[in-house]
C-alpha cells in the first residue's frame, strides 16, 4: 500500500503545482478567458463554475506574516501609545461639551454620520498649479469649511476598489498586507471582527449603513454585519430616488441629493425607534465613473480659463462642477 500512497501524494502534489503554479497565474487566466469578478462573487461562480471560482479565490486567502511581527512587537507599540497619553493637547473647540465636561461626567454621545463621497476631491486645488476656472468649482465645500472643523484625508485606493477604502476607514486595518487582487469584504471579512461600528455598539450605539447600489456588490450584504452594522439600506430598498448619467452597467447613478434624503430618513427612523445614539455609514455613487462629456448637461459644466504653459487646451477643456 505504500507505493499507492506515495503515488497518490505525488499526483496530488503535481496537481497542486499545476493549479497554483500555472492555472491560477493571472496571465494564464487571462489567456484562457477567465476574468475574476471582484464585484459579485455569485455571478463569478455562475459564469465559471464552483471549481474555478473556489480555486481563484483560494489564491487570495493567504496573508504573509510581516517582518518582525510578534506579540512582543505589538506590546511595544501599545506601550508607546500608553506613554503618549501623558501629553495633553488643547481642544479644537474649547466651549464644546467634551471640552467643558469632565470625562467621567460625560453622558452625551454624538450622532456620527460617516459619509464616503464617491471619487470626490477638491478640484479647486488645481489652481495652485496654474489651472483657473470660470467659477468656484468647490463652492459647497468652501462654505462648509467656514463653519466646520475640517482636515485632509488621503485615500488608500485610486481608480477603483471602493470596498478597500471602506474597509480601511471602518477598521483601521491596511489592505497593503493582503494578497494582490484580494478584496477584504469577500475573502477576509467572513466572521465578526473588530471595527468602528462593532466598537460603538459596545458603547451603546445603534448602527446602520446606507449605500445607493446593489447590496451584493463587493459582498457588502455579508460583510457589513460582520463589521457591526446592524441594518443596511441598499438600492433595492430605495424608492423614488433621482438618477443621472446612465451607463452600460446601470440605469443611472443615484444623486447626492437623493442620497442625502435617504441618510436623513434612516437617521430619523433610528431615532424614532430608540433613544440610543446613532452611527450611520453612508457611501454615495453620483461621482462614479464614467466621465463621458455627453453624460453631463451644459449647465453642469465649467470652463478652464487658463492653464499652465505646455498643457494642451484640449486636455483641460471642460470640467464638471462637483458643487
Question: How would you describe each model-predicted region?
Answer:
Residues 1-109, 131-152, 185-190, 194:
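N-terminal secretory/membrane-targeting segments
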Residues 92-108, 115-322:
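Solvent-exposed soluble domains appended to multi-pass membrane proteins
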Amino acid at each position: 500500500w505504500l507505493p499507492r500512497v506515495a503515488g497518490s501524494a505525488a499526483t496530488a502534489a503535481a496537481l497542486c503545482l499545476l493549479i497554483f503554479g500555472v492555472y491560477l497565474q493571472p496571465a494564464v487566466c487571462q489567456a484562457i478567458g477567465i476574468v475574476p469578478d471582484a464585484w459579485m462573487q455569485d455571478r463569478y461562480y455562475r459564469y465559471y463554475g464552483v471549481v474555478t471560482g473556489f480555486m481563484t479565490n483560494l489564491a487570495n486567502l493567504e496573508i504573509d506574516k510581516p517582518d518582525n511581527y510578534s506579540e512582543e512587537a505589538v506590546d511595544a507599540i501599545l506601550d508607546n501609545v500608553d506613554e503618549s497619553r501623558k501629553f495633553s493637547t488643547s481642544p479644537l473647540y474649547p466651549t464644546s461639551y467634551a471640552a467643558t465636561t469632565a470625562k467621567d461626567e460625560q453622558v452625551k454621545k454624538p450622532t456620527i454620520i460617516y459619509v464616503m463621497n464617491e471619487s470626490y476631491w477638491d478640484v479647486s486645488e488645481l489652481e495652485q498649479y496654474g489651472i483657473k476656472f470660470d467659477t468656484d468649482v468647490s463652492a459647497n465645500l468652501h462654505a462648509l469649511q467656514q463653519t466646520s472643523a475640517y482636515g485632509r484625508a488621503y485615500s488608500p485606493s485610486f481608480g477603483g476598489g471602493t470596498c478597500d477604502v471602506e474597509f480601511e476607514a471602518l477598521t483601521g486595518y491596511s489592505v497593503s498586507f493582503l494578497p494582490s487582487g484580494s478584496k477584504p469584504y469577500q475573502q477576509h471579512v467572513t466572521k465578526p471582527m473588530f471595527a468602528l461600528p462593532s466598537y460603538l455598539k459596545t458603547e451603546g450605539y445603534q448602527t446602520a449603513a446606507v449605500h445607493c447600489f446593489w447590496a451584493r456588490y463587493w459582498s457588502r450584504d455579508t460583510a457589513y454585519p460582520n463589521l457591526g452594522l446592524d441594518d443596511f439600506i441598499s438600492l433595492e430598498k430605495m424608492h423614488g430616488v433621482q438618477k443621472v448619467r446612465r451607463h452600460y452597467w446601470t440605469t443611472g447613478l443615484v444623486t447626492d441629493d437623493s442620497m442625502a434624503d435617504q441618510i436623513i430618513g434612516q437617521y430619523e427612523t433610528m431615532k424614532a425607534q430608540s433613544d440610543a445614539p446613532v452611527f450611520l455609514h453612508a457611501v454615495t455613487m453620483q461621482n462614479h465613473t464614467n466621465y463621458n462629456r455627453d453624460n453631463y448637461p451644459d449647465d453642469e459644466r465649467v470652463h478652464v480659463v487658463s492653464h499652465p504653459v505646455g498643457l494642451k487646451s484640449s486636455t483641460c477643456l471642460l470640467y464638471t462642477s462637483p458643487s
